[in-house]
Swiss-Prot record:
Zn(2+) binds at H437, H501. [4Fe-4S] cluster binds at C581, C584, C589. One of its GO terms (molecular function) is zinc ion binding. Homodimer. Binds 1 [4Fe-4S] cluster per subunit. The cluster is coordinated with 3 cysteines and an exchangeable S-adenosyl-L-methionine. It comes from the Bacteria. Its EC number is 4.1.99.17. GO terms for cellular component: cytosol. GO terms for biological process: thiamine biosynthetic process; thiamine diphosphate biosynthetic process. This is Phosphomethylpyrimidine synthase. It comes from Escherichia fergusonii (strain ATCC 35469 / DSM 13698 / CCUG 18766 / IAM 14443 / JCM 21226 / LMG 7866 / NBRC 102419 / NCTC 12128 / CDC 0568-73). Keywords: 4Fe-4S, Iron, Iron-sulfur, Lyase, Metal-binding, S-adenosyl-L-methionine, Thiamine biosynthesis, Zinc.
Amino acid sequence: MSATKLTRREQRAQAQHFIDTLEGTAFPNSKRIYITGTHPGVRVPMREIQLSPTLIGGSKEQPQYEENEAIPVYDTSGPYGDPQIAINVQQGLAKLRQPWIDARGDTEELTVRSSDYTKARLADDGLDELRFSGVLTPKRAKAGRRVTQLHYARRGIITPEMEFIAIRENMGRERIRSEVLRHQHPGMSFGARLPENITAEFVRDEVAAGRAIIPANINHPESEPMIIGRNFLVKVNANIGNSAVTSSIEEEVEKLVWSTRWGADTVMDLSTGRYIHETREWILRNSPVPIGTVPIYQALEKVNGIAEDLTWEAFRDTLLEQAEQGVDYFTIHAGVLLRYVPMTAKRLTGIVSRGGSIMAKWCLSHHQENFLYQHFREICEICAAYDVSLSLGDGLRPGSIQDANDEAQFAELHTLGELTKIAWEYDVQVMIEGPGHVPMQMIRRNMTEELEHCHEAPFYTLGPLTTDIAPGYDHFTSGIGAAMIGWFGCAMLCYVTPKEHLGLPNKEDVKQGLITYKIAAHAADLAKGHPGAQIRDNAMSKARFEFRWEDQFNLALDPFTARAYHDETLPQESGKVAHFCSMCGPKFCSMKISQEVRDYAAAQTIEVGMADMSENFRARGGEIYLRKEEA
């Protein structure tokens, strides 16, 4: 925690400097590699961690070394992780998927925006200073066409996006030759299908079955294809966004870039303050990962924050606005039904979802059914025209462990299952949002209920938090639950930062939340037995046993913190080659002792072997050459 708190002006200036001087940056001793596919333009980025060799013998003057293989890892940082790419936030990222979208021939450019709100914003000269300069000309599906990845998958089409994902999910593990690195414990997958090698056909089949989604709006061509499904790597989402109280456009762009650097697979823009439209445009044009939103937040801003004044027309206009900007998935709270609201009256903490409480208030004030539920088919028609995935929101999720797994929570979940089938009628991709606050012994039921009632659509949960006693540490309390539910089959985990329940997260909070959740996701992949998940762990363990300190730092999820902690007590360069750390010192290091025991045992084996040979030699009479019949 910083010693001095920056003023708002200083925070904005710092963020502006960050994005003005932004360059592609690699992690220490890592380099960007690309693996190409068969489709034109399929060039999948990964980070390769370079390792130092292992000392295996020789003399001080002529040591002998054995090379250690470089470790390829999944990389969400996009162009920001490649030092060879020139970054210009004012211009945005290259449109990676544009040629693929155009080649399909099923979209058309819009000469006029569909949203009245967008038209008004574009006509307002007073916003010119805030506006992203290179506004994208939006596309939509041609009349009678659907442009979703689910639509293509159901027709047996393997898209470039699917091939890109197959290569990405394999994480370059085919490059690893060492048996030590390839060793992996069997997992317990709870019914997940985890093939040894992920093919583009497997990706297509999972999407076609609705078990996985590829969030990829045709108006967000800058994004690198990724997949969310329980038969793939567990993903992590980071939330950013301004509020009426704090944050600015430059700070949100900074948080976006920061999030992708630290492993966010998707980012949700939850802005509720001024200039939501303009902020989102900057984020989308500079995001290599899918962007999600909760459209009801902006719709509420359009009616001056009065939930009772919300209308379907205002909400529909917001969907069109965001779809044409390029939002990849919408959280829609269509399962908060009028008859479910009284079920929350017995709760300790009531309705804690912002979207859920907005819709509950609207339903009660009008005594009408949720207009998102009533107009759900129209929502699906919009999504099908732009390939916006639906994240069906858990507006009645528990906000305390006392309220976990109650009647209201599961009633809504069952409704989300009904809505999933409707969305699939329109070839719209769907995932299901989940809790919340759930003690450990009650977590697995959430997964089994979701699989059964939501037809194996991907599950996307906030945590869950396993205890309510640790404000300031809720990234820990929720990371425990996230690891568990990820193991049970949850496809994506929404991070929680140390500021949860306390305030809007800053850059450092975003990093802490992401590191915690990358640990949880990776632990879940290990427990499930995801092929190749253990390679990095094995490389780290080998480096640790061999006292290759630099490699230990570089293999870490956060190399900078690992190095800083080591250097607090052993800052000298000699500490980077020492066969001990400050925890135990040179005399009591268990790994150093283990090495000595191993070397001693090997020497003893040789000595015993030599003694046996000597005894055998004497027993045969001490002759140098044996007679032929004795040999």
